[in-house]
């Protein structure tokens, strides 16, 4: 009897392991079929014991994977890896509007930022770092609450992002909880360094007007788990995160620098400073300046530099959970290749865009002040990354003004995230900012807190 039970147990373990690894097997088969070197390279990045172990630990904690959620859905027969949506077959696909954002549908038929097709790739199992998982496991289910100002507070009344490193509201029940889970993703790592980020200003004829090259830095100032200084950063008390930008070219704006420090207190505005080299002076900005473009000609504003980065305040914004669903979105394979395949001219996509099926929550952020440039932001939040898979920004007339869609540079062996590419499209005026990023993984250790002092940042130019 003992032998029989042992054999049954071993079979169950093997079955569970096999099921949890199926996403890797799917990628192996897919890469063999396409024969594309970038797909083979992605298989090499995920086909190892370290990835399997980390993916399994996150799956065990969540109680699901992207694949298990998709398995519960009745998906169209065509919607599987290898299928390519084109302008020739899209009209024969009655389901396409249920999964593919309108912006991408239009790319198949429009002369503005056109593409040849959208290839479905296998769904990947994403996760964050093990240390973030461990910190989250330590929390009690009711550890956090949201107060009357919309602040995240722990059970002792302290600011949640200051006192804890774990993720809040893993199973969000409403829009406010989902918004804080999204905020907790941050940038998916303790430190971020772009060297460089290229921001191309593109017109309606798909021509490049200007390209800005810059460094972007970001640092989690509290709840650090994976890179020194661990915990909270001395000298930045009350601050949850900091971002900095330094433009390197073109020459007329070289040296433009911005630093933004985010306080946990909803009543304390961001410490937001901008150095303007042509004037040789530093300006103190306010939260409303976050609506301004980062540089002339760009659709990218300070509030959208990581899809959505304005401050949470339930007195100014309403956060509403709309639905759960499935969306086609770019895979986070940027550590190996760019699934958008941005052309060398910086303003076009070179042909076939890769997308995968992702389970998401959709929530809306509604402006209550009637003074913000967007009346609503619609955010599709991934159920594994807890970050935006797609974002729509609605103008004061109720029409879509801009969309944000990006691809991440995700490191499978560690669960760390940075970025690879992004499109910020002004669908109203047919302009776009197309971004390519070189995530400087090898330079993270060189980052210091001095970067987040505007006087010292400007001297780096």
Regions found by a protein language model. Give the residues of each.
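C-terminal soluble interaction/assembly domains
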Residues: 366-441
């Amino acid at each position: 009897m003992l032998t029989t039970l042992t054999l049954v147990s071993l079979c169950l373990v093997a079955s569970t392991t096999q099921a949890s690894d199926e996403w890797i097997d799917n990628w192996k088969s897919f890469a063999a079929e396409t024969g594309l070197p970038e797909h083979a390279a992605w298989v090499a990045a995920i086909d190892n014991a370290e990835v399997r172990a980390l993916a399994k630990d996150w799956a065990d904690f969540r109680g699901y994977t992207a694949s298990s959620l998709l398995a519960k859905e009745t998906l169209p027969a065509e919607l599987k890896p290898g299928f390519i949506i084109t302008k020739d077959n899209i009209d024969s696909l009655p389901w396409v509007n249920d999964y593919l954002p309108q912006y991408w549908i239009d790319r198949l038929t429009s002369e503005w930022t056109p593409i040849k097709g959208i290839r479905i790739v296998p769904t990947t199992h994403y996760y964050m770092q093990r240390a973030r998982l461990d910190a989250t496991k330590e929390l009690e289910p009711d550890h956090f609450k949201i107060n009357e100002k919309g602040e995240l507070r722990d059970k002792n009344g302290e600011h949640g992002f200051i006192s804890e490193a774990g993720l809040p509201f893993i199973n969000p029940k409403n829009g406010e909880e989902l918004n804080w889970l999204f905020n907790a993703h941050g940038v998916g790592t303790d430190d971020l360094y772009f060297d460089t980020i290229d921001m191309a200003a593109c017109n309606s004829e798909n021509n490049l007007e200007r390209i800005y090259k810059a460094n972007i830095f970001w640092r989690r100032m509290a709840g650090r788990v994976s890179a020194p200084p661990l915990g909270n950063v001395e000298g930045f008390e009350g601050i949850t995160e900091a971002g900095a930008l330094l433009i390197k070219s073109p020459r007329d704006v070289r040296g433009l620098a911005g630093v933004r420090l985010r306080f946990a207190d909803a009543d304390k505005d961001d410490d937001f400073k901008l150095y303007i080299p042509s004037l040789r002076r530093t300006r103190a900005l306010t939260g409303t300046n976050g609506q301004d473009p980062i540089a002339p000609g760009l659709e990218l504003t300070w509030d959208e530099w990581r899809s959505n980065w304005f401050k949470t305040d339930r007195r100014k914004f309403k956060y509403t959970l709309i639905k759960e669903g499935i969306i086609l979105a770019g895979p986070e394979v940027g550590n190996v290749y760019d699934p958008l395949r941005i052309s060398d001219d910086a303003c076009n996509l070179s042909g076939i865009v890769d997308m995968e099926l992702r389970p998401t929550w959709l929530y809306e952020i509604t402006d209550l002040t009637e003074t913000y440039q967007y009346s609503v932001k619609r955010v599709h939040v991934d159920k594994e990354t807890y970050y935006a898979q797609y974002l729509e920004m609605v103008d004061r007339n109720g029409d879509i003004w801009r969309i944000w869609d990006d691809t991440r540079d995700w490191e499978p062996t560690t669960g760390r995230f940075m970025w690879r590419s992004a499109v910020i499209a002004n669908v109203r005026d047919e302009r776009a900012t197309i971004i390519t990023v070189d995530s400087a993984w090898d330079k993270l250790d060189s980052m210091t807190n001095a970067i987040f002092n505007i006087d010292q940042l400007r001297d780096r130019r």
